[in-house]
Amino acid sequence: LHAHQAQAMEQERNFIVATGTGSGKTESFLFPMIEDLLSSQKRSTPGVKAILIYPLNALATDQMHRIARLLFRDLGDPGLTLGRFTGQVQSSAKRRDEEAVLQRMPVFRENFGEDAKVPEGWLLSRKEMLDTPPDILITNYAMLEHILLLPRNQDLLKGANIHWMVLDEIHTYTGAQAIEVAFLIRKLKASLGIKSGTVRCVGTSASLDPSR
């Protein structure tokens, strides 16, 4: 482990990881988050337990593959489920079709092998996630607002028991956008009845100005 990863794992409070690209900032929150979610009490509770918010769809997609590799390959599928809920995800596509698309992607083949099956815990369509919300939800702030506003999406957070909230590339939230995201998070907490101090909030950045 890098020093910043070890320090993050020891934290039991909110923290920000500001370190260079390729230095393992994603693992800084993933390792303690997964360890926490695998505790017997949290594991037995259905619903979304962690929300990972990215500013861009491309980042959300890239991180989905990294987290899937860690969960389903490196950790041998410990029983947590993963889903990405963005505008690029099909609403009700057949899982077989979505699996075929995923299996053709070079990043999937690189992570899992040429003939690997898609892990069952990797939820691929919005319908799958609405029917059985994932433990770890990847999204962006615009889609999170849709989830909270649109009745057809609200089942995604039904019964949610949020323990972790991660904002990646936190330095990108400035000015009016930062205010919008702050209010969105407050709205999320209010709608789910989240009490202060019950959620670990993490911010990550590879470009954070030291003066900030």
Summary of predicted features, one role per range:
Residues L1-A18, E27-E35:
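Conserved pre-motif I regulatory segment
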Residues Q5, V17-S23, E169-I179, I185-S211:
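Conserved helicase ATPase motor motifs in RecA-like P-loop NTPase domains
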Residues E12-V17, P46-A50, P133-D135, R200:
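Pre-Walker A (Motif I) flank of P-loop NTPase domains
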Residues K25-L37, M64, V181-I185:
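Motif I (Walker A/P-loop) of helicase-class P-loop NTPases
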Residues P134-E145, Q154-L192:
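SF2 helicase catalytic motif II
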